[in-house]
Amino acid sequence: SQGKVRAQLMGSGTILREVLAAAELLSKDFRIPVDVWSVTSFNELRRDALEVERWNQLHPDEEPRKSYLEQCLAKRPGPYIAATDYMKIVPDQIQRWVPGSFVSLGTDGYGRSDARKALREHFEVDRHYIAVTALKALADDGALDRKTVSQAIKKYNIDPDRPDPVTL
C-alpha cells in the first residue's frame, strides 16, 4: 500500500461476515489496512443525524453538535464502502454525513438465488466484490494505482463483462 491508504468498510447484519472476510482479503492480498464498522441500523443513524441537523438549524448561536455518525467517522481516512443485504438505498441514506467518498453495495434487482452465498455473488455484494469496490474507491481517490483493481478482478475471478444484476 501507499502512504496513508486505508479503507472503511461498513456492514449491517449477517453481511458483516462478508465485510470481515473482505477486510482480510484486502489486508492479506493487497496490504490495505481496513477499519470495519458494524452498523446496527442505517435508519437510526440517519434519524440521529437529522435530529442533530435540526437542532443546529434552530440554535444558530450555540456550538454546533455532531451526530453520532459524524463523531465516529471524524478523522477516519479512506473511502467508505457500505454493504447490505437490502437495496443500496438503505445505506445511501447516511451518505451526506460521511466525510469521504462513499459507495453502497446492495441487492437491487431480482434475485435468482437459492442460498445467501449465491444471492450475494449474483448481486455483487460478496467478499470479493466488497474488496474490489474498496480498491476501486481508493484508486478513484488517487490513493492506489488502477492496475491494482484490475489485478483484484482477475485474482477473484470476477467477470467484468457479465450483465448488471439490476437489469436481469
Predicted feature locations:
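Thiamine diphosphate
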Residues: 1-168
